[in-house]
């Protein structure tokens, strides 16, 4: 696998809640400390450029090595946070996450990517709607960029998500 996608937080340093089951924590744990070090270095460079309070914007991906993971790269992206209700702006931000990750794959000559369910955990994006947006966005991108990718995987954690993706992809 050329890249796996990490649903990151805006600090881009991984989850700091011990034993937390979010994908961000799992990726940083299994990749090894080198991943957190690379993320920290990249964020230091961005803070030097944009100011000490810089946080990674929603839908803007960042690529790193994957270290101990069975992939070449990790593409970290901050998904939208649903605070009160789902809006069309939040839906567009989620679609932008998928589009921007695929564009980053294209720019870096990566031909396979595994997406996690972006924003459906603690960021509270409704799971079914997130799956619909993910599949629709990826399918449209693949039509617009034929032969750009050899393999796109939707990797799910919950049975609920598996059911949604299976229904949508039929």
Question: Can you name each region flagged by the protein language model?
Answer:
Residues 1-170:
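Macrodomain-like recognition of ADP-ribose-binding/processing modules
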């Amino acid at each position: 696998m050329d890249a796996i996608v990490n649903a990151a937080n805006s600090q881009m340093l991984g989850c700091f809640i011990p034993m937390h089951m979010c994908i961000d924590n799992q990726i940083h744990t299994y990749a090894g400390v080198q991943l957190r070090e690379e993320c920290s270095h990249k964020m230091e460079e961005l803070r030097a450029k944009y100011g000490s309070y810089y946080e990674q914007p929603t839908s803007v991906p960042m690529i790193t090595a994957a270290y101990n993971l069975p992939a070449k790269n990790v593409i970290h992206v901050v998904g939208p946070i649903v605070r009160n209700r789902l809006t069309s702006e939040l839906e567009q931000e989620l679609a932008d996450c998928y589009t921007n990750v695929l564009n980053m794959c294209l720019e870096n000559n990566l031909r396979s990517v595994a997406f996690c369910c972006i924003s459906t955990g603690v960021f509270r994006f409704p799971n079914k709607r997130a799956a619909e947006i993910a599949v629709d966005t990826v399918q449209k991108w693949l039509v617009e960029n034929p032969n750009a990718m050899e393999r796109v995987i939707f990797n799910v954690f919950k049975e609920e998500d598996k059911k949604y993706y299976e229904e949508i992809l039929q």
